[in-house]
Amino acid sequence: MTSATKTNNSGSISSPIVVALDYANKDAALAFADRVNPRDCRLKVGKEMFTLYGPQLVRDLHQRGFEVFLDLKFHDIPNTTARAVAAAAELGVWMVNVHATGGMRMMTAAKEALLPFGQQAPLLIAVTVLTSMDGGDLRDIGINITPAEQAERLAKLTWDCGLDGVVCSAHEAVRLKQVCGEDFKLVTPGIRPEGSDAGDQRRIMTPEQAVAAGVDYMVIGRPITQSPDPEKTLKDILASLCKGAK
């Protein structure tokens, strides 16, 4: 294990917000990071930014005090996926994900690849059904059950493989907590504060609704990154969550 490893998998902040850092420009992404407090959120680096700027972007965010969710959705043969997950752990990310449809052998190999990292291993979660997909999209690829049924099936498989949780729609959260237990982490995209544009997400929910449903970490992008005052927007969302919890 290298000195790049930054935090243990429990993380060090209590905020449930993960901001999707979806920029095509590194300077713009870092400028955004400099405008928000790392105690208020974690940051998600996805395929576009990681392809453009690589591991150094993650290191730059770590240097600013942020915990990073590396959202690359690995889906390959077991050995290749395991090596990729181990590389993410070496980089020191807080969370990394794979596609549950890669199957039991792939997910088990990924989990075993993190054993040498002990308490410093990132959270390992699996993607169930993309929040942009509805029943028609599933039928197009030969899956003739509802998104909720498919998400539950894949969440059970993920739990059986010993992973930490799944990426899912907030609409499946209550059921998945019942099936997989309270310790099974639920990470949900498609979260939009009241009044925000839904964008390309079809199955959306507000932050307050997501927390009430049992979501552990909510991914929010443009409503925060495109805000004139992203730090205020973050604070407002956190305040609404605290108010809703009372």
Curated annotation (Swiss-Prot):
It holds the Pfam family OMPdecase. The active site is at K73 (proton donor). It comes from the Bacteria. GO terms for molecular function: orotidine-5'-phosphate decarboxylase activity. SUPFAM superfamilies: Ribulose-phoshate binding barrel (SSF51366). It is an enzyme of class 4 (lyase). Its EC number is 4.1.1.23. The keyword Lipid metabolism does not apply. One of its GO terms (biological process) is 'de novo' pyrimidine nucleobase biosynthetic process. PROSITE patterns: OMPDECASE. It catalyses: orotidine 5'-phosphate + H(+) = UMP + CO2. Substrate binds at residues 22, 44, 71-80, 131, 192, 201, 221-222. Keywords: Decarboxylase, Lyase, Pyrimidine biosynthesis. Signal peptide: none annotated. Pathway: Pyrimidine metabolism; UMP biosynthesis via de novo pathway; UMP from orotate: step 2/2. GO terms for cellular component: cytosol. NCBIfam families: PRK00230.1, pyrF. Homodimer. Belongs to the OMP decarboxylase family. Type 1 subfamily. PANTHER family: OROTIDINE 5'-PHOSPHATE DECARBOXYLASE. HAMAP family: OMPdecase_type1_B. Catalyzes the decarboxylation of orotidine 5'-monophosphate (OMP) to uridine 5'-monophosphate (UMP). This is Orotidine 5'-phosphate decarboxylase. It comes from Yersinia enterocolitica serotype O:8 / biotype 1B (strain NCTC 13174 / 8081). The lineage of its organism: Bacteria, Pseudomonadati, Pseudomonadota, Gammaproteobacteria, Enterobacterales.
